[in-house]
């Protein structure tokens, strides 16, 4: 899975898990990413849309595209924006309430 970025954020959008693949594909070492808001990797021009969708998902709203593969622009440590292909998944508690989100991304 070193060629896949796995990023997990809590319900506030704070990065809780950053895989070795995320470090390789996006450029930030784990210790620089953990504890940061996902704004770290969301290009500025997409942040408003991102936070609208993330907030809706954390309130229990639908996620589009649920489990489907899609292209996602990601801001790398170098400052470049790279398009990665992947999926988003909402993480839920035993009571089924949203507690965070996981992205699994790879180079197309």
Q: What residue ranges belong to the model's regions?
A:
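Short loop/turn elements at sensory-signaling interfaces that couple input to output
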Residues: 85-102
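PAS-family sensory/regulatory domains
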Residues: 32-48
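Conserved hydrophobic beta-strand signature of PAS-family and PAS-like sensory domains
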Residues: 6, 14-16
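Conserved beta-strand cores of small sensory beta-sandwich domains that regulate signal transduction
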Residues: 5-9, 73
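PAS/PAS-like sensory domains across diverse signaling proteins
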Residues: 12-14, 24
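PAS/PAS-like sensory domain cap-loop motif
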Residues: 21-33
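Terminal output helix/cap of sensory domains in signal transduction proteins
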Residues: 44-73, 78
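Glycine-biased flexible loop/turn sites that connect beta-strands or occur in inter-domain linkers
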Residues: 78-79, 96
